[in-house]
Amino acid sequence: MANPGLGLLLALGLPFLLARWGRAWGQIQTTSANENSTVLPSSTSSSSDGNLRPEAITAIIVVFSLLAALLLAVGLALLVRKLREKRQTEGTYRPSSEEQVGARVPPTPNLKLPPEERLI
């Protein structure tokens, strides 16, 4: 049960995130008077021994943490909505909860009893 808005958010959000955190992947911004471009250094996001740089690891952790938090929030919202819907449609009828509290109290002893009925 995927949300189409989530795909749109990922499609639009990840390039923005990459543009903002480009240096975490080893990109260097160079600006001159006549051009704007991104230049990749000779060693990109991995060092000479094949391990990722700490900035890249941090960026990956942040992205997946945000994604997990978003999925958790959406899941909890759907769960709450479903529980409210079930509570409204599949409740049980308990007439005892609708009874008045004073109805179960025995009558006080000083009340007069009605006269006894007799046969004609």
From Swiss-Prot:
Effect of N36D: Abolishes N-glycosylation. No effect on localization to the apical cell membrane
Subcellular localization(s) per the UniProt record: Apical cell membrane; Cell junction, Tight junction
Gene Ontology biological-process annotations: establishment or maintenance of epithelial cell apical/basal polarity; positive regulation of cell junction assembly; protein localization to plasma membrane
Gene Ontology terms for molecular function: protein domain specific binding; SH3 domain binding
Residues bearing carbohydrate: N36
GO cellular component annotations of the record: apical junction complex; apical plasma membrane; bicellular tight junction; cell junction; extracellular exosome; plasma membrane; subapical complex
Protein name: Protein crumbs homolog 3
